[in-house]
UniProtKB/Swiss-Prot annotation:
The gene is tuf. This is Elongation factor Tu. GTP hydrolase that promotes the GTP-dependent binding of aminoacyl-tRNA to the A-site of ribosomes during protein biosynthesis. The lineage of its organism: Bacteria, Bacillati, Bacillota, Bacilli, Lactobacillales. GTP binds at residues 20-27, 82-86, 137-140. The keyword Protein biosynthesis applies. Residues 61-65 are annotated as: G2.
Amino acid sequence: MAEKEHYERTKPHVNIGTIGHVDHGKTTLTAAITKVLSEKGLAQAQDYASIDAAPEERERGITINTAHVEYETDKRHYAHIDAPGHADYVKNMITGAAQMDGAILVVAATDGPMPQTREHILLARQVGVNYIVVFLNKTDLVDDPELIDLVEMEVRELLSEYDFPGDDIPIIRGSALKALQGDPEQEKVILHLMDVIDEYIPTPVRDVDKPFLMPVEDVFTITGRGTVASGRIDRGTVKINDPVEIVGLKDEVKNTVVTGVEMFRKTLDLGEAGDNIGALLRGIDRDGVERGQVLAKPGSIQTHKKFKGEVYILTKEEGGRHTPFFTNYRPQFYFHTTDVTGVVELPEGVEMVMPGDHVTFTVELMKPVAIEKGLKFTIREGGHTVGAGTVSEIDD
């Protein structure tokens, strides 16, 4: 048994999720995938009800319901997320609570693309989910094959509209419910869908293979040795004698060299993504580095003040604002490990933003921060979270 355990770890890991309009069959498809793969010993079958009863989670001060399902194909190990409500999807994608490397867009052939179909495609584009495979569901309920062709064409056009390769995206037709009920033809369709996902959604670059980045959480001095910046490594690796830059909150970037890496008071040869470490920095005094800055591989990240954000604003019930806000709203934007005040500029045609809204707006920060497309942030007022966002574009 232990050997099998070891083998499972060698499969590449990919995060995916189901997206699409309410009642188009996202959860049924998720259940069908687990059922069909369980028959090959690659998953534990989960029924609709258990996936639908998604547990509540908190991600950066926001409550989200998400179901996490695991399964394998012959080639890969997958973590699959499915969210019960539309608001849960929006919050999930914006907060990055469930990071997706690719998505299965479920569209009912009986309805065609609907408003949430469009909104989920837009969200996928804005938050950096770059690969979509389409499952055209409920095709057994449509008598005229020409109608299905028409729906497929509409879906392709919609994807192209949001800069996805609409003409090339794989579209699989089938019935998730029939597969779940054990129809052998539809079970084959599910296996085909998984083959397509294996092929079309690339294995992501592992965090450790990306350029080094560590948001600084704390700074202290070790007498006789120098200044230590501590934090959790976001990506990449760091070792003794690596050159790093101290970036953020100030206009100039400082260059230094890591002269020691420690974890739990022990010296470490190599710190990697996920590790909480302290990095000893050559020639940097106590006030030469501060919380909210980042240590990074030279040249890998710049500071910016102006960006566009894809944002979800909490409702009053979620602990958010009770009233709308307008252009020139000035909350704090919490990036990495610190708050920076910023001024909000709403897009043309948007007069105000209500609690519970999903909106794209421009922010001008009071201080430069090390940010890049895809970075997550929280919006706060007096220490309370009132929203969450993803940087969708750098504007300066």
